[in-house]
Design a protein with these regions (language model features):
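N-terminal Sec-pathway targeting helices
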Residues: 1-13
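Intrinsically disordered, low-complexity segments enriched in glycine/proline and serine/threonine
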Residues: 6, 16, 556-558
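Terminal signal-anchor or tail-anchor transmembrane helices
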Residues: 11-21
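Sequence signature of WD/YWTD-type beta-propeller architectures
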Residues: 20-529, 535-543, 547, 552-572
Length: 573
């Protein structure tokens, strides 16, 4: 990237950040003289958690000092300090002593102006249950339109929630657009959605986890190649034993990227949800992808699936599908009037959660999950606890991803009365995942910032959740976090992910730079991958090969374009 582009990008992020801060503060003013903003009252911390930052707000300018007192209710330990400013972090050594000497009882935090009469206080406590595993998440700028244009600004990060160090960068910069990732229950395999090109949005990698994970031709697959038509392969999820992947085929979505202004468009910068789709399961041993009977009904969209920990059932989102034009196969709805009706909320789209037997890929009867269906709301993002007892899901008035009103609910896996989690903050609570020991959920929320933060909440054996804590070390200026997923490995385990797969965009970039030697080298690697191409891909490659001086290869791909399926073909025998 040129120096000019870097300056422009930094300037844009700075302006966006300043505006977001102004708007957020305007909407979150506290009428009292001063009030404690964080930690939340009655928050429950993991025993390994590093020292949090204590923050407070005030509407009266204070040039004086503050007195803070942090003490165990049993009287065994206390920390008293006088300081300037509206933020304080105890030393790690004192915080560790406080946690140990609290004996898992109450910890009081008291705040007052130096010499003042009024005191604000909150109570905290430390759980006996550790988190015990790291979290892999995506870090990116907003709005999405900027992230898509600057893939090098997106990273995959791996965080040890008990570490005092910064998160580990597992993959710096994206070579192509990347989205959902999942792990097998034993933490030995990873599945990662990384596009294979502009037209093939169905690229997917499955790899064993090691210190360095290579994404290359050995572990690449394309849902589009298998289906012989364009598909996203939305919300793909590895089975607990790592043998199967449940995904969405024949999918079609409503997608709208909003312009940078107004501010709300920056914060919630995209509308995206599936309106058509069948569930399908890929068997890694047999190398067969087969639609799941009972969850492949044309009249419904069936997507956003997850497994029960025993691998016997699949829980997924279902809604009445939009009709298709049988003459054209599209993965994005093109009817702009229809899209605008969804954007303006003149039309609704609501999902229910269903559960279906896997039955070795033979499926069965899909049944609605009581408490997560038929409630007049949209229910989505099911996540089953590893002990098989609880189902946490999101609920909003409409749609699916990035909903401002998204709230998390919990219900027994067999269905029942759903209960709203106490961990829900004021704006967007979503993309939750269970710790391997079934005692914590990690999730994303805009409740403390218009940039998305990571939070952690305890859930006990009875499904009762505690007040959450903020994962401060995941915060980076001008970046959001999303897609947090636990890896069933020791908390301090790290790995690196490297992308070593060639697609047309790489060759196109080399040709644009007039680096024809590099372009020819990439073309050789591309052919060695035995790539899947649509007709338009063959035409584009033919033109590039001609520019590269490879006339015979150019003619070969021009001829292939005449006999290869077009990306908008509806069906192909």
């Amino acid at each position: 990237m040129s120096k000019t582009n870097i300056i422009i990008a930094v300037s844009v992020f700075a302006v966006i950040s300043a505006v977001l801060l102004f708007v957020f503060n305007r909407h979150s003013r506290i009428p009292n003289d001063f009030a404690i903003r964080y930690p939340f009252n009655k928050a429950l911390f993991p025993p390994e958690f590093p020292a949090p930052s204590f923050e407070w707000t005030t509407e009266v300018k204070n040039n004086g000092s503050w007195e803070v007192l942090l003490e165990t209710a049993n009287g065994k330990y206390s920390i008293h300090e006088v300081l300037k400013g509206n933020r304080w972090t105890p030393s790690e050594s004192k915080w560790d002593s406080l946690k140990v000497l609290s004996d898992f009882g109450k910890i009081w935090f008291r705040l007052s102006r130096e010499g003042g009469a009024r005191t604000e206080k909150i109570v905290l406590s430390v759980s006996r249950d550790s988190v015990g595993a790291p979290v892999l998440y995506r870090q990116m700028p907003i709005p999405f339109i900027i992230a898509e244009r600057r893939l090098d600004s997106m990273n995959f990060m791996l965080i040890n929630l008990g570490s005092k160090s910064k998160p580990h960068t597992a993959m710096k910069g994206f070579p192509v657009c990347g989205n959902c990732h999942s792990f097998s229950g034993d933490g030995n395999n990873i599945g990662l959605d990384l596009d294979a090109g502009l037209r093939d949005k169905g690229g997917y990698f499955i790899s064993p986890i090691s210190d360095t994970i290579m994404f290359n031709k050995e572990n690449f697959m394309s849902w589009s190649r298998i289906e012989k038509k364009r598909t996203f392969g939305l919300f793909s999820k590895l089975s607990p034993d790592g043998r199967y992947v449940v995904t969405t085929v024949r999918d079609r979505v409503i997608m709208k990227n909003f312009p940078v202004n107004p501010v709300e468009n920056i914060v919630f910068s995209q509308l995206f949800f599936p309106v058509n789709g069948h569930l399908a399961v890929y068997d890694r041993q047999e190398k067969i992808l087969k639609e799941l009977p009972g969850a492949n009904l044309e009249e419904y969209v069936q997507s956003n699936a997850t497994w029960t920990p025993d691998g016997k059932y699949i829980v997924y989102s279902r809604a009445a599908a939009l009709p298709r034009d049988s003459n054209i196969y599209e993965i994005n709805v093109q009817d702009q009037d229809l899209i605008d009706q969804y954007v303006s909320r003149k039309k609704s789209f609501k999902y229910d959660l269903y559960i279906i037997p896997f039955n070795n890929g033979n499926g069965g009867e899909a049944k609605p999950v009581r408490g997560a269906s038929g409630n007049g709301k949209s229910n989505y993002f099911p996540a089953v606890s590893p002990d098989g007892k609880w189902l946490v899901f999101c609920q909003a008035e409409n749609f699916m991803l990035l909903m401002p009103d998204s709230r998390m609910y919990i219900v027994p896996i067999g269905g029942g009365k759903a209960r709203e989690l106490r961990g829900n903050l004021s704006r967007m609570n979503s993309w939750h995942a269970w710790s391997p020991n079934s005692r914590w959920i990690v999730y994303a929320s805009k409740g403390m910032s218009l940039y998305t933060d990571m939070f952690l909440a305890h859930i006990d054996e009875n499904g009762e959740d505690a007040i959450p804590v903020l994962v401060e070390k995941a915060r980076v200026p001008y970046r959001v976090i999303n897609y947090p997923e636990f890896v069933n490995r020791k908390a301090g385990y790290t790995f690196n992910m490297k992308y070593d797969y060639v697609e047309l965009a790489h060759i196109k970039r080399a040709v644009a730079d007039r680096d024809y030697e590099k372009a020819r080298e990439l073309f050789g690697r591309l052919e060695d991958q035995n790539p899947f191409f649509f007709s338009e891909d063959c035409t584009e490659l033919s033109d590039m090969l001609k520019t590269m001086g490879l006339a015979s290869e150019s003619e070969k791909y021009a001829e292939m374009a005449k006999h290869t399926i077009n990306s908008n073909v509806f069906d192909q025998e």
